[in-house]
Amino acid sequence: MISNFKGGDPMASIDNQDLSVTKHHTLYDAIDPTSALKSSASGKVIFITGGSQGIGQATAVAFAKAGAKAVYITARSEQALKETQDLIRQTNPDTQCAYSTCDVTNTAQVEAAVSDCVDRFGGIDVADANAGYLDKWAKIGESDPKSWWYAWEAHIKGAYHVIRFSMPYLIESAKRWADKGSSGGHLILLSSIGAQLLFPTASDYQTSKHAINRLCEFVNVDHGQDGIKCFAIHPGGVATELARNMPEDHYSYLTDTPELAAGFIVWLASGKADWATGRFLSANWDVEELTSLKDEILRDDLLVNRLRVRADS
């Protein structure tokens, strides 16, 4: 999954990083939490960072629609968290919701948020590392060092914190649901198609997202035997507040709804894609067509990051 971009339009290289399946831009039946995935989250506790707006908020609401026992959300704005909590309660009064203000780069705050979630609701079945950061793009030699590095702090350190502190509870979840003949212990890491591309001036965002994909693979290597299912996902091109920091000529690619990503995450947490653990997946991909490619993906070890070299003849 290596971009061949050498100049011109970097988006042209996306086709080299994509599956030949139908692409979706809005919610559709197979990932709809009110139809195909109705009650799929019943009895489960969902932990979401960056859960107060955009994709995180849509994901929290989607899990409520899918019948989650509880949704725990974190973000830095208490007012936005309260608004999302109210929205979840309106969506499904039977889904409990709690929140805490939290900076994902702060070790103590993430640990405290995870502990609070477990104290309130008894565990964690799905952890979604959704919080992100995107500043104005700049060439490496013209970038702000503090801002450039903060992208890594928010994406990698933030995801690591979620993984590290939720892991014991996710392992418990995986075992508990397996004993019931079902699936638990799901971990979602927010990546991007940009992880596979080379956009001039996007080095901080795209390198950190590329590292997310590798981190996902390591979770699978270290904890796959514990029943953990981890996915690094491209949520689609969503016109979030952060995305507006991209150059304006990229805005035309922001055509996907946050509900698409949210439904895709609920689908992943349902156990239907457990076979694809440790891999990069896109919310745009039709899930039924993706599933039809299971044997090929596993046989050829696709949707992972590897160095491509020419074999000796």
Task: Report residues per predicted region.
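C-terminal helical subdomain
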Residues: 6-10, 21-27, 232, 248-313
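Conserved glycine-rich cofactor-binding loop
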Residues: 45, 52-54
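Conserved glycine-rich Rossmann-like NAD(P)H-binding loop of the short-chain dehydrogenase/reductase
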Residues: 68-84
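The beta1-alpha1 cofactor-binding region of Rossmann-like NAD(H)/NADP(H)-dependent oxidoreductases
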Residues: 79, 101-113, 145
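Conserved mid-core segment of classical short-chain dehydrogenase/reductases
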Residues: 111, 119, 133-150, 168, ...
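Catalytic loop of short-chain dehydrogenase/reductase
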Residues: 133, 171-225, 237-238
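Catalytic Tyr-X3-Lys loop
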Residues: 141-163, 187-188, 212
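A short, exposed helix-loop element centered on a Lys and neighboring polar residues
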Residues: 163-164, 217
